[in-house]
């Protein structure tokens, strides 16, 4: 995913914290515009990864998530199977849920349906908004 424009007029590109960390550790960072681009796929294959990790990303083509021998897992901001797909935090707050969480699971053909590896729970207070729940999940997911 390309760096995001920030600032008053969006004229400055800022690397994500994940990219900054990877670069500080000398890890390769791939940022394709198209996930089916053959140059990107060749570069990804050349890494010979045993495992891939995806966080908060769009649907990956099977050729990408099926590449590592151990598979690819994802961190999703809900207690799957509840709130599969987009905006799970928003739906938990809109629906007045008292609890949400994060699920780590292996990617498969259908969105957010793979084998669950782990789930962590996070209470939602009556006064919590989407931003508070988001921040709580991000802190929990990073730990």
Outline where the language-model segments fall.
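One-carbon transfer enzymes
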Residues: 1-143
């Amino acid at each position: 995913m390309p760096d995001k424009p920030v600032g008053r007029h969006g004229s400055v590109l800022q690397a994500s914290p994940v990219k900054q960390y990877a670069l500080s550790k000398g890890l390769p960072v791939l940022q394709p515009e198209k996930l089916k681009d053959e140059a990107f796929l060749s570069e990804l294959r050349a890494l010979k990864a045993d495992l891939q990790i995806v966080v908060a990303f769009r649907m990956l083509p099977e050729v990408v998530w099926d590449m590592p021998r151990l598979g690819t897992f994802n961190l999703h901001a809900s207690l799957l199977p509840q709130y599969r797909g987009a905006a799970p935090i928003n739906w938990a707050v809109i629906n007045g849920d008292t609890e949400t969480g994060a699920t780590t699971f292996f990617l498969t053909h259908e969105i957010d349906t793979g084998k669950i590896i782990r789930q962590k729970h996070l209470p939602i207070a009556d006064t919590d908004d989407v931003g508070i729940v988001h921040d709580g999940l991000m802190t929990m997911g990073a730990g």
